[in-house]
Swiss-Prot record:
Keyword Chloroplast: no
Gene Ontology terms for molecular function: mRNA binding; zinc ion binding
InterPro entries the UniProt entry points to: ZC3H15/TMA46_C (IPR032378), Znf_CCCH (IPR000571), Znf_CCCH_sf (IPR036855)
Name of this chain's protein: Zinc finger CCCH domain-containing protein 15 homolog
Family according to the record: Belongs to the ZC3H15/TMA46 family.
GO biological process: cytoplasmic translation
Keywords, ordered alphabetically: Coiled coil, Metal-binding, Repeat, Zinc, Zinc-finger
Region of interest called Disordered, as start-end residue ranges on this chain: 1-70, 336-382
Disulfide bonds: none
Xref: Pfam families: DFRP_C, zf-CCCH
Cleaved signal peptide residues: none
Taxonomic lineage from the root: Eukaryota, Metazoa, Ecdysozoa, Arthropoda, Hexapoda
Organism: Drosophila pseudoobscura pseudoobscura
One GO term describing the cellular component: cytosol
Biased composition regions of type Low complexity, renumbered to the chain: 1-11, 38-50, 352-364, 372-382
Amino acid sequence: MPPKKAPAGPSKKTEQKKKEKVIEDKTFGLKNKKGNKQQKFIQQVQKQVQAGGHHPRQDGDKKKDEKEKKLADLREMASIFKPVQTQKVDKGTDPKSVVCAFFKQGLCTKGDKCKFSHDLSLENKVEKRSMYVDMRDNEDDLMTNWDDAKLKEVVDKKHSEEKRRPTTEIICKFFLEAVEKSKYGWFWECPNGEKCIYRHALPPGYVLKRDKKKEDKPTEISLVDLIEKERAALGSNQTRVTLETFLAWKKRKLQEKKAKMVAEEERKKSDFSKGKQFGISGREMFSFNPDLVDDGPIEEGDAAFDVYKREDDDDDNAFEFKELDLAALSLAAKEVDGSGTIASSTRLLDQATEAAKTAAAEDGAASDDENPSSSAPANDAAPFNKDLFVDLAGELDDLDLDDEDD
């Protein structure tokens, strides 16, 4: 009987839809934001979800390992074939003081025309000169290998060198300067010459200034490592953030802020009473001593004002806190009272009756106003003169009036 096939996993489309759903949930309401922080957060979430939860540092370590492997392969190939590279000489250096690289490999075909030296004895001078050894302190050879001529030569040189040897342990400033600037080498010569009485060697344990700067430079740490380090330093015994702990923390912070403000105000009042006015604003000065406002009679151009003492009301600045309890809120909830908000079935009939009563009342008031005015005589009317405009037509004909249009 063949073995059972393993259950097929979810398809790629299903996985992609799940990832898109997760991205949409985490970035809800942020896609239309144009801020730089929001866009960076969206890109970070997309990378994390698409990577399937892999830590970004793992990918970085993998790339680093691949790069180191390639460099190791290149070094191995170079050690096998040993290709001769074209020599480059620094500016100001004599090429004859450098041994030809092709000549050492037996590949130089230029002979005497080669600009580099073919003297292999220069190999010893190519070695870096030690900064901790003074070349004038060389020990003499053993006397067992000397002959008479060598002994005489050594005696003469010994007495002559005693006059030229350094007589102090102070280090030469030119030597220190050359070492600090990386100019010290086989071809370096002291400006004081061979007769320089100062030491041309560093004492044991001496640290150069350039090395001190490298040691003082702080080691750089990546953001991911810093976050992981801080998280590990927190430990596991931490308070979980809930509604109750947050409200308690907020209450404590507000009380601390209020106490700090009161203490600061008391300190400023104490300083002001002692005559110290540094750090006190003008408003605080007048609030501490309102008598400063009444500084004399009002002059021309001054504004009138009134002075009064304001009583401090601590109740205005009091803060009340109330903890939210979901169980108490659910018990206090009750059904909404609908009295006065639900329309009755006879509302239309009541409106018609009220309108009829209002119309009847208005008609009665209008009839009462018309009857007294029609029955009462008009005793206050002025008498009318019938002959007032009899001769007015003749007077109008005698007037010479010019037409305004002319």
